[in-house]
UniProtKB/Swiss-Prot annotation:
Cellular localization per UniProt: Golgi apparatus membrane
Family according to the record: Belongs to the COG2 family.
Predominant location category: Golgi
Record's protein name: Conserved oligomeric Golgi complex subunit 2
Pfam families found in the cross-reference section: COG2_C (PF12022), COG2_N (PF06148)
Subunit description: Component of the conserved oligomeric Golgi complex which is composed of eight different subunits and is required for normal Golgi morphology and localization.
InterPro entries, sorted: COG2, COG_complex_COG2_C, COG_su2_N
Species this protein is from: Caenorhabditis elegans
One cellular component term from this protein's GO annotations in UniProt: Golgi membrane
Annotated signal peptide: none
Mode of membrane association: Peripheral membrane protein
Upper lineage: Eukaryota, Metazoa, Ecdysozoa, Nematoda, Chromadorea
Amino acid sequence: MGTLHGEKTMFASPNTFYIDESKLCFNKTHFNREDFNVERFMNLARQKSDLKTIQQDLRLYLKSVQNSMIELINDDYADFVHLSSNLVSLQDSLNKIEQDINRIWDEFKESTRESVGMAERIEQKCDELCSNREKQIEIRDRIYFLVAIEKLSEMLLHPPRKCSALWLQKAASFASELKGSTFPHSEEENAAEKIILSQLEAVLCAEGVRSAAGDCQNLPLIYSILSLTESTHSLTALLVSDLLYAEFVNEKHDESNQLKLLKQVFESVKKMRETWAEKMGTEHFRGNIRRFLDETLLTFILTFIDKCMGAVAVPSDTRLFHECFLLTQEFIDNWPSSHTCRAMLKSIRDKFNLLVYFKLETHRFGKQCDQLMSPEMFAEPETSENRENTPQLHCGVSRAIITAIEHVWSDDVYLPPIVDKLWDFTLKLLLKHFSWSQTMKNYFMEEKRDWTSMVTLRSDTGNLHQLVFDFALESIWGKFHDITVDTAPFGQCLTKHGRSIDSLCVQIDDSIIEMFSEVLHQEIAQVSDVPKQYRWTKKSPPTTHSKYVVTAIEMVENLKEKLCCEEHPHTDEIVRKVNLSAFNYFVGKGNEVLDSVEATGSSLSRFKRKTTTDSGSTVTDDDKIKQQIYHDAKYFLSYAENLVFSQADLTGLQEVVNRFDKDARSAIVQEKNQNEEAGNA
């Protein structure tokens, strides 16, 4: 049935093989799936048809696919043949175009051959013309050069005593022709130029000094000529040596008062500048001539400092150096044209060796602090030397550091250019003191075990930082504001250091509590000796507390007084911890004694009662021991109730007191029973 069905319906025409895909017994899209599986495909197909039908449909579908491939191949081949024929036609067209282009290019070259030759001849003539013109210019330049040398030599042969404006203008004209020559000259011409210019320079410099000392009218023209010949430095040197130095500096000046001499020079320089500006007028005293005269005056100051102020520039007397530098800085700040003479003004300031000055002012303090930092130098000086209304400093190194900081920032020492070095010096001293405090803390903990020295160390550690911080607010920040420096980063630096100081102070406080508690425990440990005082000693029963209790409380009060004297910020807390440690230690030791008495004293008590029946005594040695510890605990408890303690803190003491009351009641009952038994017997 499948074959008859295929023969009737599968072909649309004898030339075209066509099948109706909808009537196939399978779905051809299954072949396009990536997960195609033969077994699965056959299972699906057999649900619709038998194997024979499936085989026939597969053959028909295969034939259809083959026919489609043949048609595609035929179509591609036809396109290929058509494309090949078109390419052949295109190649013929390209060959024809190439032949036409070559023919046209040959005709163009032939037609322009004569024009090209003419252009080459014109270019050759132009090159010859340019060469001739260059030679003409060179010859003309050489003529002007030689004429200028000749004219200048004639003018300089008999130079005038005082140069007129006309003479200077002629000299300027000839000098410009000399310097304007751009072509190379012979050695003889160069030598002649050098000689003429040196003679002209000498005449102009001498005239420049006369003009500067007189009306200054020719000075701008003289400066222009010397600028052209690049000889202004010669005029500067002559003005400094022959005019300014000779007029402002007395060779017999008193070297003992260098500050006064420097002040006179600065005033004379300012006055000379004002005189030149007044004589030349605002029309001429500007631009290059003003810059030249300013640099000349500043050059004179540099020369003066080198010759007369060497002992000041390299400081031997720091106070004189400080005053001279401030005077110089004031002169620099008030110089009228500082924006154009910044380099010269900086050179004047650099004449003062600030690094040497800084080292001279700080070296002795650094050396002194290093000497005072050894443990052997730790001592408490006279408190009368401490200043009023300021935290007290005991140790020599602490006082030396605050003195050094106040000294270097004082108005007699401080200089704005070394503010960075002064701040570094301040920080180094603070860090050095911090390290010293750590070292001394460890020394007192591990070797000396001295709580009083530890209290002194704690006081100096906190007070020094507070002094420096207050000093920074009162003095250092003001100096930073004067030079427009933001103080916020520096304040943060001190705050960070303060946190380190606070942490160290907490450690020192803990060490104070630990060491003092050890000493206090040694005193309270005498509670263990109470049994020795009453066992077999026939002492009367105790009626008050022991002496060691009073001594221990006096020791705590001495600690409190010491801390209050040092204005310790946590005095009450430290005393509370020390007292609590003492109470707990007493409770532990007291209970040990009571436990020992109860464990070993019952048999002794019975024996002593038998041996002392005739005496009528009812108080045993154990009772005396318990009474003594009771009185001691009661005294501690009474003392503690006047302080700030919670009920939980005093539980141990209360238990010791209550323990005696309980034992006393038990003893009374027991004694009553024993007496009744004895009466019955």
